[in-house]
Amino acid sequence: MNSLIKENMRMMVVMEGSVNGYQFKCTGEGDGNPYMGTQTMRIKVVEGGPLPFAFDILATSFMYGSKTFIKHTKGIPDFFKQSFPEGFTWERVTRYEDGGVFTVMQDTSLEDGCLVYHAKVTGVNFPSNGAVMQKKTKGWEPNTEMLYPADGGLRGYSQMALNVDGGGYLSCSFETTYRSKKTVENFKMPGFHFVDHRLERLEESDKEMFVVQHEHAVAKFCDLPSKLGRL
């Protein structure tokens, strides 16, 4: 347990960027229990609102990127909590099946006992008649991220699905590289493992100008038994 990371932690976030050339800025604040893997965040669009695209494509960059709030089961070293007080960064490319591409660069730091996130995002090639630009998405299904050590950090892959108005899904693939600001020689790296995520929107108002969302995340090994004794 990292003494700098308490059982209840506050967080603040600033996100700015563009989607299909449209500029915007969001801020958020929240709290949660990093050791239970639960967190709640309240997010406001402070520039460029109401957004002309679905807020859902931003949602994963607020909390699916809030990696300090993951419960790690026994035997899995916590790459993210070990990274403090220096913190960590991550870069992600999300490719949607309709051709849209969403990239994120995020920095996580610890300031006066509060987790502070700065995110730069860029979305391109989202079809004007697609679910994202028509604002016809209805939230993310739960998913599992696969993680393993790579290039001195962690590499994450996952397939995700957005619910769409009228039934059906818009699927996408996530590829994320996580890097600690601390040299990896100073802490224990985890091996191959998974993280289950459930990201839910609890509240929204004013045409998605204000959103409250909650996430529960747990790191684990495969639940299936191995004949070779592997985890």
Swiss-Prot record:
Identify residues that carry (E)-2,3-didehydrotyrosine: Y64
Q: Signal peptide position in this chain?
A: none
Highest taxon of source: Eukaryota
Keywords from the named record: Chromophore, Luminescence, Photoprotein
Q: Which Pfam families would you find in this protein's record? A: GFP (PF01353)
Recount the PTM note: Contains a chromophore consisting of modified amino acid residues. The chromophore is formed by autocatalytic backbone condensation between Xaa-N and Gly-(N+2), oxidation of Tyr-(N+1) to didehydrotyrosine, and formation of a double bond to the alpha-amino nitrogen of residue Xaa-N. Maturation of the chromophore requires nothing other than molecular oxygen.
Cross-link named 2-iminomethyl-5-imidazolinone (Met-Gly), sites: M63-G65
On whether Metal-binding is a keyword of this UniProt record, the answer is: no
Q: What binding partners and quaternary form does the record give?
A: Monomer.
Miscellaneous comment: The emission does not change over the pH range of 4 to 10. Maturation occurs via a green intermediate and is complete within 12 hours. Recombinant expression at high temperatures induces oligomerization.
Q: What does this protein do?
A: Pigment protein.
What is the protein name for this chain? Red fluorescent protein eqFP611
List the source organism: Entacmaea quadricolor
